[in-house]
UniProtKB/Swiss-Prot annotation:
Described purpose of this protein according to its UniProt entry: This protein binds to the 23S rRNA, and is important in its secondary structure. It is located near the subunit interface in the base of the L7/L12 stalk, and near the tRNA binding site of the peptidyltransferase center.
Coiled coil spans: none
Top-level taxonomic group: Bacteria
Cellular compartments per GO CC: cytosolic large ribosomal subunit
PROSITE patterns, sorted: RIBOSOMAL_L6_1 (PS00525)
Subunit structure: Part of the 50S ribosomal subunit.
Organism annotation: Rhodopseudomonas palustris (strain ATCC BAA-98 / CGA009)
Ribonucleoprotein keyword on record: yes
Top-level taxonomy: Bacteria, Pseudomonadati, Pseudomonadota, Alphaproteobacteria, Hyphomicrobiales
GO biological process terms held by the UniProt record: cytoplasmic translation
Keywords: Ribonucleoprotein, Ribosomal protein, RNA-binding, rRNA-binding
Protein name per Swiss-Prot or TrEMBL: Large ribosomal subunit protein uL6
UniProt GO molecular function: rRNA binding; structural constituent of ribosome
Length: 177
């Protein structure tokens, strides 16, 4: 059994945490986030740390309190450091560029793909083959990166497409004559 939930989440200086019922709110230098904890989990703020505990000794409650603790730790990291996902584009003629508040992707289709950047997310294009997705909410950052990758996922023969910077593409060999 994992013991992630037993460790309290320390709130660093410069971050204010409030617990109202089942809602945990964090406010820091990068912004404000909140998370609603499941009813099977007790949440308290004491001694500069947020503590979670299962309300009942059921398997579900024990699983949820570890998850709740990890989510609260993500709130703290988000409002202090933020989260970033890096994407790489591989392929001849494949490139990305910013067009106002939209991301323009040339991915081998007959048209360019325009991606509307959601609220709370910052996208930068340092090179035409690199995309950085930055934000304070890890779920939103991951979702945006996944949506961009889904426009042209990497294919296993030449590796062309949009991939995460740390992703390994299993390569296949072509047909034999």
């Amino acid at each position: 059994m994992s013991r992630v939930g037993k460790k309290p989440v320390t709130v660093p200086s410069g971050v204010t945490a409030t617990v109202e019922g089942q809602t945990v709110k964090m406010k820091g230098p990068k912004g404000q986030l909140q998370f609603v904890v499941h009813d099977d989990v007790d949440v308290k703020f004491e001694d500069g740390a947020v503590k979670v505990a299962p309300r009942h000794e059921t398997n579900r409650a024990r699983a949820l309190y570890g998850t709740a603790r990890a989510q609260i730790a993500n709130l703290v990291e988000g409002v202090t450091k933020g989260f970033e996902k890096k994407l790489e584009i591989t392929g001849v003629g494949y490139r990305a560029a910013m067009q106002g508040k939209k991301l323009q992707l040339a991915l081998g289709y007959s048209h360019d793909v325009l991606y509307d950047i959601p609220e709370g997310i910052t996208i930068t294009v340092p090179k035409p083959t690199e995309i950085n997705v930055v934000g304070i909410d890890p779920q939103k950052v991951g979702q945006v990166a996944a949506e961009i990758r889904d426009y042209r996922p990497p294919e296993p023969y030449k590796g062309k497409g949009v991939r995460y910077a740390d992703e390994f593409i299993f390569r296949k060999e072509g047909k034999k004559k």
